[in-house]
Amino acid sequence: MNIFKQTDSLSLMKGMEKETVDLVLTDPPYIISKPSGFKSVVNGEKRFAVSTEHGEWDKPENFSLEDLGESVNEYYRVLKKHGTAIVFCDLWKISKVKRLMEKAGFKQIRMIEWIKTNPVPLNSKRNYLSNAREIALLGVKVSKPTFNSSYDNGIYQFPICHEKGRFHPTQKPYPLMWALIEKHSNAGDVVLDTFAGAATTLIAAKNLQRKYIGCELDKEYYDKAEERLK
């Protein structure tokens, strides 16, 4: 049972039976898109800022925290007891996403941190720190989740995806998703990603002998992701 559809998160899950998934691992829109690049600033000096213009799918008129909350509720419904959900989110929305997960019923909420070993510098005196990390929140349905490790500090260090093989602006590195799936599920388990993007989660699940269910709404990304899954 490997399923990949071109549809939205809620439409996919509304057709799923409850308690049929072992692990949710997903990277929804951060809702941070805005124009950037070379701009005139103080005293006419031009400075460069890394683009956060990811696309229409990442804008508040097309996706909101309320929309994410509906998906989180469905994650809880389709997860088996003792299942785990890992949801990537914007650094500045951690507390809001945590509340969404708590409201849905998730317990043992923890933070996972991806440290980028080759971050893109921001090159700005006003915002001088590099974009060197991203955050995911982990929640458990009921208790006693699958955890294939004796210890984990929740910090993962991997480089960002190189241009070769990268076509999605927020594409996560394969080794990161592989590590998360390996630790939080077992062979034969079902992994769900309802914001599949480049389908990296689904590919890692397949290679780890897990089953996968996923979807991607954007037609261009869906077609490219489907090719990667072949």
Regions found by a protein language model. Give the residues of each.
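Conserved SAM-binding loop
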Residues: 225-226
